[in-house]
Amino acid sequence: MHPATHPTSAPDGRTYRTPLLRRRLLRGLLAAVVALPLVGAAAACGDDGASDGKTKISIFWWGGDARAQLTAQALELYTKKNPDVTFETTWQANQGYFDKLATLTAGGNPPDIFQIDDNFLAEYAARNVTLDLKKYQDAGDLDTTKFPPSLLQYGVVDGKLAGLAAGENTQGLVYNKTLLTKNGLPEPTTGMSWEEHIAWAEQVSKKAGVPGTQDPSADYKAFWVWLRQQGKDLYAGSDLGFTVEDVTKWFELWKGARDSGATPTPDVIHEGNATDITKQLVVTGKSATSWVWVNQMPELKKNTSDELGVIAYPGDPSAQWARASMYWSVFRGSKNADLAVDVINFLANDPEAVKLLGTDRGLPSNMDLRRVVSDDTTDPAMKQSIEVENKLAETFGESPQVPIKGHSKVRAELTKAAENAQYGRATPAEAAAQFVEACKAAIAS
Amino acid sequence: MALTTAPDPTRRGTGSVRPPATRRGTGRIRHAEGLAGYVFLSPWLIGLMGITAIPMLLSLYLSFTNYDILTPWSEVEWVGLANYERMFTSDPSWWHSVRVTLSFALIAVPLKLAAALGVALLLNRAWRGVGLLRGLFYLPSLLGGSVALAIVWVNMFNREGAFNSFLALFGIEGKPWVNDPDWALETLMVLAIWQFGAPMVIFLAGLKQVPTELYEAASVDGAGKFRKFVNVTLPMLSPVIFFNLVLETINGFQGFTAAFVLSNGTGGPVDSTLMYTLNLYITGFTDLEMGYASAMAWVFLIAIALITVVFFSTGRFWVHYSDGEDR
């Protein structure tokens, strides 16, 4: 790199004791510094595994240990049938999942297949991160013939099939059966109006000494069902599907419930507003009901020794729909897109794989296999949630559009506004106005 | 490094005093030596450039764009000052987070320093076992920004928490502190104040440096304990107070972990714990508005720099350096 430096040319006769050794050492170090990233790059290339004729598909999801085991088994099955394909699986808890997915995407290195939900599907689809699966569907490489049409439709964003439903769920009102029986109280039923539900909850509070129902005014999925029953929707095109008046009515409904003692105090409501399953009031014993998704029943059951029941949210149950609990999406820039699509096709339609996966991600999307799985299952909580959902499926209404860009902010703003009203820091009308204004800003940007 | 006394030009990187005649030859050696220097520096240098400097500059660029993480860099649009404009004119939650952070820092930092100084004064004696006590008081700050600690805090200060059980002993009915928008931030302040160990240790070291003859002289002049504290301890300690104040203020503004854990990453209840950094995080990673979040980060950086400048420029009025002249 440098012309040889003659040692004697050093000033004041000073010489290096071992110039050659030094220089060699120096060069060695330099080489090491330069080479290190290369080694890393070489290792990274090795990941593609192109050399041994095998393809490695990366797949990323959120969930717990149980899901990880089931998914790994299903993927092993795929490898067994297609020995040339192996998987690089990554999974983690829901908290932080989307941060990581976004970061991976930003780094230009997202997984070939990733799990996503309706909170983010539109965000990713609108920015062309997801592969449009329509082409594969048309070519018959992705079999959706056994899917309920509304469930499939709930993965369509701007005319593109952005995600394939990995499971189906719907809103479920979970109540503590043991508590009700002990106090000689009636169980709530599907079809009760919101007013009836609140009156029932008031009665529970009085007799059982436990607040009858969690106040769901901060919960977008409850608000959504209620809106649909009023002939409105959460979104209409790229705009909001409701007005300040609607929100005011919604907040006032629950103010009445709080005033009559049907709900817990605001701080407890706030605890229950966390999305964490273990914090749902029905399992922490701080309320007789919680507003959740039907497929969360088995998970809730693990956190309480009480018996739980589940029904639809109050009002007309046809406001509920076959919601994709989560989707599988394929990265648009994936080098192995065709294979990746084949894998999600396998996860949705292979009888053995679907049996393995069970209802962990919601009811299987393939209706034929759903029947098989529900006949086979032995877990009582799972059986219960399947039965309820199958019954609700008879009355399901049409799917709404997938939530638009800015939805996560809208959810956060609803929680903020509702809690403002709950803590008595704003009237329902003030909170509603604040919410709508914040939403408009959120979806505009 | 600068203290090396031997003028050995071949071993010093900067050798501008060398005679011109030998420059060419030494130049090569210097080159090699300089290169060696960089090679040995490289682990740190690569870290600084790759992890700090370059990303910082990129974020400065991003702050003028509408970057949203998911869109490729090539499609990012330059929006000029729009992000900054939005922050100051049409983002109530930004202003809210500024207020939350300011009130947190203005209350928690002085109280933390007062607690640290108070305990340091108590522990600055030659009791037996005082070392153990110092260790115990220092312990909480070892746990620093730990998530576990924040979780413990949440459980201590909720409705059924240990703190309310303690209050119940005196017949006082507690509040759901962490779940009450009027008290959640205060709970975080108490957590921050409780971790006063680090400044305490520095205060202790400073107290040991105060010459005892000053106290003796003060005693001779008839000064009581309070006068001695005000007229001897405080002035002698002022450089240490200044150091702690600057450091803790910067720390206070950057509080994140506890607020994140306490509110499940939302800044709730009702945005009462929406610290600036938490708001920045939510904006960047949940709302995916990374360009706007970058602008927020730069405003934050400049604000902290300004505050530090204010500290340094007012320091000369009250910070006393004991080497005879005030700097």
Model-derived features: where do they sit?
Chain A
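Extracytoplasmic "Venus flytrap"/periplasmic binding protein-like
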Residues: 76-146, 181-184, 280-284, 289, ...
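Short, low-complexity disordered leader/linker segments with a strong preference
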Residues: 1-58, 80, 430, 437-445
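Short, well-ordered beta-strand elements
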Residues: 53-64, 85-90, 112-113, 162, ...
